[in-house]
Amino acid sequence: MQFKVISASDLTHNQREQIAKLCFEAFDEDPWSQYAFMQNAVHVIGSVDNVIVSHALWTKRNFTVNTIQNIETAYVEYVTTDLSMRGKGYASQLLKYLIHYLTLSQYPLAALQPEDDEFYKKLGWLPWKGNLYVQNGQSLYQTEDVEILLYPLNKEIEAYLKSQHQLLCTDWREGELW
């Protein structure tokens, strides 16, 4: 499988169509159908014979973890693999590539809201065990019944996450808050 990282604005029409098809099959929506912030997403695609078979994207969000504020976080979404190609390790390979890319890009943290947390935990993602909040202006709103997984991308954040699980907060956004 060949990997490529492409900003949303640089995707070709064919790439957009392939990504939309993959995401619609998996999530019953495509990344562009609902939220304006997805126009600024960065996509990572895995291709076999020039056909996109696996996909993920991330958007930049600022997280607060306990007392550490403004942690630039790669918030990962729309992770999927073509239905006919599942079970071959493509999504795992894609996520390993993504983590490597984000580490080289000096992001301190990656996060996602999983549909299958065991899949991500096998790849080293850590469950957040504390409270979750979103911030809108000066107000904080606790969010319940949401599971967030984190992937520390540097040693400082990794050590901090192993010792602290009190408050995780991010910025308000349209649509799904997490």
Feature locations, PLM:
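A conserved beta-strand-loop-helix scaffold within acyl/acetyltransferase catalytic domains
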Residues: 3-80
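Short loop segments at secondary-structure junctions
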Residues: 49-50, 84, 152-157
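Short acidic (Asp/Glu) patches
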Residues: 59, 94-98, 129-136
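A short, internal acetyl-CoA/4′-phosphopantetheine-binding micro-motif in the GNAT/acyltransferase core
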Residues: 76-86, 115-116
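Conserved acetyl-CoA pyrophosphate-binding loop and the N-cap/start of the following alpha-helix
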Residues: 85-97
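Short secondary-structure capping micro-motifs at structural edges
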Residues: 97-100, 107
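Conserved active-site alpha-helix within GNAT-family acetyltransferase domains
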Residues: 104-108, 114-139
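C-terminal "cap" of GNAT-fold acetyltransferases
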Residues: 134-178
